[in-house]
Amino acid sequence: RDRSPSRGLGDVYKRQPDWLSLTGKGYVASMYKKYGKIISPMGCRAFLSPWYEQGGMHPAFDGDEPVFVGRFNIGVVSLHLPMILAKARKESRDFYEVLDYYLELIRRLHIRTYAYLGEMRASTNPLAYCEGGFYGGHLKLTDKIKPVLKTATASFGITALNELQMLYNGKSLVEDGAFALEVMEHINKRVDEFKEEDGNLYAIYGTPAENLCGLQIRQFREQYGIIEGVSDRPYVSNSFHCHVSEDITPIQKQDLENRFWNLSNGGKIQYVKYPIGYNTLAIKSLIRRAMDMGFYEGVNLSLSYCDDCGHEELQMDVCPKCGSKNLTKIDRMLSLIHISEPTRR
């Protein structure tokens, strides 16, 4: 982390493409500024809701500190927002009535999961539940693990906000976004109510949907067919992100996605993909800008190079210089690296 705006980044930005702001705006930075506690992302984007040492979900007094180390998330169930809107229209029902039904359904699933897991014995994982691996994990082998679960979060996942907006009025998140923002505010309000009523640490998670993005399209097409900008591609957009086909600058992408940033505190990331031959000074500037805005920022890179002549391009299937198909392709997306190499004979 870079605590001083005047401090140089050196070459760290080349080695660490994920950046977490502790001094900018928003939830994660506010916890660090007030308590000196870092909410480290789990996996590529998940963040824990605060649990206070004395007060639990809420601080018992001003000095009551949150605990993040040793805690975990028990799972996420994701909404299919475009399909919910399509269903409401087909049945001539209010969209928010249908949305609330599915929010309630996810709520019941989470309650059931807490109850089911709570009946398990600490002997299923002694390191976690008996020897302190998890926060509060000092149970006897025969104890049920329910007391440990009170600090665990359960998430309501969000995908395809771009496709939701497109279905609503034919405009993308770049062109509009007001309806998608209204929906996110409604979901936050309802989940906050569930949280207080149930005493469970529910969170809202911007689902990456690596596999779900394809499943949701197939589900939508089976019911409602192919709609331009909604289901005409083999995938839906990741969480609240602008569609990958949008012709926008990295700064525009940061600003557009910032609208939803504080409405997905259970899991989120903002990222930009750079071509080879990138402007390193521009990347430094964008990282600093992201830190000022309070982002968890990812720098995505791609590279294809010819193993025969050494030619490099962002993407290629055949080398334009020598005609070789003997290529190595590297894709670095968020915290995931994929390397594709030719078959050696």
PLM segments and residue spans:
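Cys/His-rich microdomains that often coordinate metals
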Residues: G310-L314, G323-N326
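Short cysteine-rich clusters marking metal-coordination/redox-active sites
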Residues: C306, C319-C322
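Short glycine/threonine-rich loop-to-helix capping motif typified by GTGT followed
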Residues: G133-G136, S172-V174, E210-Y224, H311-E313
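Structured mid-domain segments that build the active-site/substrate or prosthetic-cofactor binding neighborhood
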Residues: D11-T159, E163-L167, K273-I276, K284-D307
